UniProtKB/Swiss-Prot annotation:
GO terms for biological process: translation. Keywords: Ribonucleoprotein, Ribosomal protein. One of its GO terms (cellular component) is ribosome. This is Large ribosomal subunit protein bL27. Belongs to the bacterial ribosomal protein bL27 family. SUPFAM superfamilies: Ribosomal L27 protein-like. GO terms for molecular function: structural constituent of ribosome. The keyword NADP does not apply. The gene is rpmA. Residues 1-22 are annotated as: Disordered.
């Protein structure tokens, strides 16, 4: 058994690409239907009024309007889109 690891071997040098998750549109911003509001793992922010949920828990606007973030209960946050009138 060699007690040194051969000349050119390296065990490091790998890195995965960033997932680009997080809030994409903040409160008070205008959105169009279909715009992505939040990319997330699991439902840490829930879908409120006029907001849909994708297969990967992505939240998106169902109507044109203005984004608001509000507390659903003491522990759960939700995002809603209200039509601009």
């Amino acid at each position: 058994m060699a007690h040194k690891k051969g000349g050119g071997s390296s065990r490091n040098g790998r890195d995965s690409n960033a997932q680009r998750r997080g809030v994409k549109v903040y409160a008070g911003a205008p959105v169009r239907a279909g715009n992505i509001l939040v990319r997330q793992v699991g439902s840490s922010i829930h879908a409120g009024h006029n907001v849909g949920t994708g297969r990967d828990f992505t939240l998106f606007a169902l109507v044109d309007g203005v984004v608001t973030y509000e507390w659903k209960s003491n522990t759960k946050k939700q995002v809603s889109v209200y039509p601009a009138s």
